[in-house]
Amino acid sequence: MSATIARAEEQQNGSTVELKDDTVIVVLGASGDLAKKKTFPALFGLFRNKFLPKGIKIVGYARTQMDHNEYLKRVRSYIKTPTKEIEEQLNSFCELCTYISGQYDQDDSFKNLAKHLEEIEKNQKEQNRVFYMALPPSVFITVSEQLKRNCYPKNGVARIIVEKPFGKDLQSSRDLQKALEPNWKEEEIFRIDHYLGKEMVKNILIMRFGNEFFNATWNRHHIDNVQITFKEPFGTEGRGGYFDEFGIIRDVMQNHLLQVLTLLAMERPISFSAEDIRDEKVRVLRAMDPIQPKDVIIGQYGRSLDGSKPAYKEDDTVPQDSRCPTFCALVAHIKNERWDGVPFIMKAGKALNEQKTEIRIQFKDVTSGIFKDIPRNELVIRVQPNESVYIKMNSKLPGLSMQTVVTELDLTYRRRFSDLKIPEAYESLILDALKGDHSNFVRDDELDASWRMFTPLLHYLDDNKEIIPMEYPYGSRGPSVLDDFTASYGYKFSDAAGYQWPLTHTTPNRL
C-alpha cells in the first residue's frame, strides 16, 4: 500500500517525468578529471545520437577562472574527433555550452550561477534543471545546500546526480544522507554507480528471467559457486593520495561488485519499474550477513618481477607506511532459500596481469556414473572488455572414439551485433536521469544495507595495525594464496582439457 502511494506521489511531483524541453544540465566540477573523461564525452555521445532534450543548454561550473573561449577549448580537448562529421557535430555541441566560475561554499558564487541560468532560460516556459555533481565528496553537502538555496527552479523539475563515494562507512553514509534530506527528496537524487549502466550488467535481468533454462537452474541445487572479478593492469599512477584514503574495497567492491551480485541473486521483480527492481535488490542485501574477516584476503602490489614497474608505496603520493589494500578477495553468503550454501566470491585488484571484469558461475559436478570426473559447466559473462556470454560445456570430440572436450556456446557481442554500437555506461545513465528512471541508480536503503555488510570488515582492517596486506608483484594474478583461497570455497579450476577461450587448439580429455 505504502509503495503504491509513494509511486503515485512521485508521478505528481515530476520525478518520473521525462525531460524533453526547457532543460539545462549544470556540470559542477566542469574542469575536473571526471568531467573530462566521462561526463562531457557522454553528453556529446547523447547529443550526436539526438537523445538530449530539444533546446538543451549545458552549463559548466568550477573554481577555475577562464573565459568562454578557453572553456570551449577545454571541452573540445575532452572529446575525440576522428572524422570531419564528428568535428562538425562537436562545433554544434559547443554552441550549447557556457561556463561560470565560482567557489563551492559561497552564496555569491551560486547567486551568480542562478542569474546565469535565469538569463539562458528567459524564453522558456519551465525551468528544468539537472545538476551533475562531478565533485569530490568533501564538498557534496555544501554544494547541495547552495544549489537548493540559490539555484532550485521555481517552475520546473530539479534533479541532482551524485557520484560515488557515498561515504566511507555506514555512519558517514548516513550522515551524508541526513545532510541531503532537508534539501532534496529521495526521488530527486540519482546516485550513480556506473557499473549499473554497463551493457552486460543491464543484460543480467533479461538473461536470467527471459530464458527459462537459466532460471530453472539458478539456485543452490545446481550452482556450486559464483565469482565476480574486477582486474586492472595499472596501479595508482599518481592518484595514490585519493586511493589510499579509500582502498580497493571501498573503491570497487562495496559498490560496483556488490551491485552486480544483487542483480545475479535477486528474485524476479513484479515489474520493470525502478522501485520493484530496487526492492528485490534490497531484499538480497538484507539476507546477507556482514563480511567476516576469516572470509577475506588482502594484498598490496610491489615492484614488477623485472623491476620496470614501481611498488604501490613507491608512488610519491602514497604514505611510506601505507597498509591500504590494492587487492582483495572475499566471500559473501546469502541466507535465503535460493542461495543458502553458495559462496559468492568477489575479487578486485590493481596492477594485475590483465584488464577484465567478468562473472563466472560454476555449476555442480556430475556426481555419479560414467561422467563423474568430467569438468564442470560454467556460465561466464564478460562485462569488459569484449562483451560476451559463453557457456563452458562438455562435448564429444568428433571422431571414432568416445573422447570428450570442453567447448563453449559463445555469444560475442562484437561478432553477433557488429552493426550496433554499445553505449558508454555514462551515456546510458545520464539518459535514464533525464527520463526520471531510477532503475539503474542506488536507493538510500540499498546504500545503507550495502554499508552494513562492509563496515565491520573495514573498521577491523583499519583498527588492527598489525594486519599487513600480502605483497604481490605488479603484473601478476594477485597474492600467491589466491588459488588456495578460492579452492577452499569450492571453486575448481580445471585445465585438464587444455581449454582456452577463444579456442585456439584442442586437447582431448579421454574418459
From Swiss-Prot:
Its EC number is 1.1.1.49. InterPro entries: G6P_DH, G6P_DH_AS, G6P_DH_C, G6P_DH_NAD-bd, NAD(P)-bd_dom_sf. The keyword RNA-binding does not apply. Pathway: Carbohydrate degradation; pentose phosphate pathway; D-ribulose 5-phosphate from D-glucose 6-phosphate (oxidative stage): step 1/3. The active site is at H256 (proton acceptor). D-glucose 6-phosphate binds at K164, H194, Y195, L196, G197, K198, E232, D251, K350, Q384. GO terms for cellular component: cytosol. Belongs to the glucose-6-phosphate dehydrogenase family. GO terms for molecular function: glucose-6-phosphate dehydrogenase activity; NADP binding. It catalyses: D-glucose 6-phosphate + NADP(+) = 6-phospho-D-glucono-1,5-lactone + NADPH + H(+). Pfam families: G6PD_C, G6PD_N. The keyword Transcription does not apply. Transmembrane segments: none annotated. PANTHER family: GLUCOSE-6-PHOSPHATE 1-DEHYDROGENASE (PTHR23429:SF0), GLUCOSE-6-PHOSPHATE 1-DEHYDROGENASE G6PD (PTHR23429). It comes from Emericella nidulans (strain FGSC A4 / ATCC 38163 / CBS 112.46 / NRRL 194 / M139) (Aspergillus nidulans). This is Glucose-6-phosphate 1-dehydrogenase. Keywords: Carbohydrate metabolism, Glucose metabolism, NADP, Oxidoreductase. NCBIfam families: zwf. NADP(+) 2 binds at K347, K356, R360, R382, Y390, I391, K392, D410, L411, T412, R477.
